[in-house]
Amino acid sequence: MEFLPLFHNLRGSRVLVVGGGEIALRKSRLLADAGAVLRVVAPQIEDQLRELVQGSGGELMLRGYQEADLDGCTLIIAATDDEPLNAQVSSDAKRRCVPVNVVDAPALCSVIFPAIVDRSPLVIAVSSGGDAPVLARLIRAKLETWIPSTYGQLAGLAARFRAQVKGLYPDVQQRRAFWEEVFQGPIADRQLAGQGDEAERLLIEKVNGAPPYAPGEVYLVGAGPGDPDLLTFRALRLMQQADVVLYDRLVAPAILELCRRDAERIYVGKRRADHAVPQDQINQQLVDLAKQGKRVLRLKGGDPFIFGRGGEEIEELAAHGIPFQVVPGITAASGCAAYAGIPLTHRDYAQSVRFITGHLKNGTSDLPWQDLVGPSQTLVFYMGLIGLPIICEQLIKHGRAADTPAALIQQGTTSNQRVFTGTLADLPRMVAEHEVHAPTLVIVGEVVVLREKLKWFEGAQSQV
């Protein structure tokens, strides 16, 4: 190990930065965030750097470097493109036994800057010892996606009770066991969900010796339209910690595979006129599982609040006092249209977009047809495949031109994506001709003509 990782408390300490350009600015931002008082020396200094120095209560010296500039400084940064000058600064600092960092010159450094994941007070540093800084940054980027921003709040919560817990448990092993329970249980879950007051209440109960009562929790998570890369960071984290998963037909297998391996999986999918599990039973199942203390993942295709009946499910949870979180997903209209190269709005073609359920009830579709035939709007029909002949007939009957551009997107955003474009009048024929099946999204509007120019993702097959 060439460099020993240490964390330096710079608050109120004077730090010398030699250089006034972009590199000096980047380093100075980090130093200012850590509370350092900046002394910047350079013949020319960028305006943003000037403001940063003034904000830190530091000083600007518009001239060349002098060794006396090191006086009173606890850390030295050389950030110029003048190699002899950088070497001189390094030599002067080392002679005085003051830590020095020379940007992009590890051999001249006694300290180096790592790539940082900041979840203050939790801070993670990644370093390659200056050998491969790009690799360190890539690893940091991965950590940024894995560690929620709320981890800092969790660390802050623990800090407020640290002294009290130390008094209760003088033995280090007991303290470790206490905090492991906190960080792996319902207290951490509440804090990470943004429910800080509830997390603090549970921690107070635990500190006072009462076993904190916390029922399980339900995570209502939107799985997006199919491509796993479209999941949010929060969705992935909750998928990895759930004890049981209730999922529907629209959740792609590749997404389901990202759930915790040992989690129980329960299929509650619904097809038209064939509800594998009635909605009221799904609602009750969520309540029952949560009351058993389990972390329950309700995984829904698309977004749970857009034709997903997510509102009904959390109404039931709220009625029973079950904690829940809602994680939005990319809805099918947005995801599938983007992957098909069809912008839903465009100033030359459509100034509004409507998301419409095409699901028939008793063989009819009770929609405000007159509103749907207005100009400069895009219509997106969910679950519209079965009722497509009626939808097309009614739109044309109420004034939408039969030659209005239209598209069918089957299994959008996945490797099996198929896109077929034509006209409003053509859609029913296209379904039969190409054996289109659910899940398929229907888009009607002038924006469809842009697909030929804007398409970028091709799945199994597409046809115009």
UniProtKB/Swiss-Prot annotation:
Residues 1-203 are annotated as: Precorrin-2 dehydrogenase /sirohydrochlorin ferrochelatase. The keyword Cytoplasm does not apply. Residues 216-464 are annotated as: Uroporphyrinogen-III C-methyltransferase. InterPro entries: 4pyrrol_Mease, 4pyrrol_Methylase_sf, 4pyrrole_Mease_sub1, 4pyrrole_Mease_sub2, CobA/CysG_C, NAD(P)-bd_dom_sf, Siro_Cobalamin_biosynth, Sirohaem_synt_dimer_dom_sf. The active site is at 248 (proton acceptor), 270 (proton donor). It catalyses: uroporphyrinogen III + 2 S-adenosyl-L-methionine = precorrin-2 + 2 S-adenosyl-L-homocysteine + H(+); precorrin-2 + NAD(+) = sirohydrochlorin + NADH + 2 H(+); siroheme + 2 H(+) = sirohydrochlorin + Fe(2+). It comes from the Bacteria. One of its GO terms (biological process) is methylation. Its EC number is 2.1.1.107, 1.3.1.76, 4.99.1.4. The modification Phosphoserine is found at residue 128. Pathway: Cofactor biosynthesis; adenosylcobalamin biosynthesis; precorrin-2 from uroporphyrinogen III: step 1/1; Cofactor biosynthesis; adenosylcobalamin biosynthesis; sirohydrochlorin from precorrin-2: step 1/1; Porphyrin-containing compound metabolism; siroheme biosynthesis; precorrin-2 from uroporphyrinogen III: step 1/1; Porphyrin-containing compound metabolism; siroheme biosynthesis; siroheme from sirohydrochlorin: step 1/1. One of its GO terms (molecular function) is sirohydrochlorin ferrochelatase activity. It holds the Pfam family Sirohm_synth_M. S-adenosyl-L-methionine binds at residues 225, 301-303, 306, 331-332, 383, 412. Keywords: Cobalamin biosynthesis, Lyase, Methyltransferase, Multifunctional enzyme, NAD, Oxidoreductase, Phosphoprotein, Porphyrin biosynthesis, S-adenosyl-L-methionine, Transferase. The keyword Transferase applies. NAD(+) binds at residues 22-23, 43-44. In the N-terminal section; belongs to the precorrin-2 dehydrogenase / sirohydrochlorin ferrochelatase family. In the C-terminal section; belongs to the precorrin methyltransferase family. Then it catalyzes the NAD-dependent ring dehydrogenation of precorrin-2 to yield sirohydrochlorin. Finally, it catalyzes the ferrochelation of sirohydrochlorin to yield siroheme. NCBIfam families: cobA_cysG_Cterm, cysG_Nterm, PRK06136.1, PRK10637.1. This is Siroheme synthase. It comes from Pseudomonas fluorescens (strain SBW25). The gene is cysG.
